[in-house]
Amino acid sequence: MYDTLREIICHRAPTTDISARWQAIEETKEHMLFFLENHDEQRIASDFFAGKAQAGIPGLAFMAMLDVNPVMIYNGQELGEKGMDNEGFSGVDGRTSIFDYWSMQSIRAWANNGLVDGGQLNDEQRAFRESYKKILNLVNNEKALARGHFYGLAYC
């Protein structure tokens, strides 16, 4: 599902590709973990992916509402982490290292000198995090989304 959503977010594929991908995972979908970012993939906000974090919001909403599968939010994703720092062995590649003793600016801003209250986030990061919060709270609190299933209208 990740590859399909990435292509759609980057305007290289139509949204109609989702139906085929969804059908392709029919037999294994109950074992799937959905994600838009992880340590192997480039950050949505990076120059190597979409260039802006907001571009991933529709993908997050879709994944979170697709079925009852868990959705992974990767370290700083909800803050719009760009992954464009030259850290350790990684270099500037749109990813964030899991191997180096290094910290991301977005996480430091969230940690706010140990208060862990987001006190140093900028307005854009706060608004972006709020979008994530709204979507994830809706999915967890709305019974039809939290426990429901769906049937695609384009299913064939």
Q: Over which residues does each language-model region extend?
A:
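Extracellular glycoside hydrolase catalytic/binding regions
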Residues: Y2-P14, D47-G51
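Acidic, His- and aromatic-enriched active-site or binding-groove loops in soluble protein domains
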Residues: M1-I8, R95-Y101
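Loop/helix patches that line or flank the sugar-binding groove of alpha-linked glycan CAZymes
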Residues: T16-S19, E26-N38, R43-C156
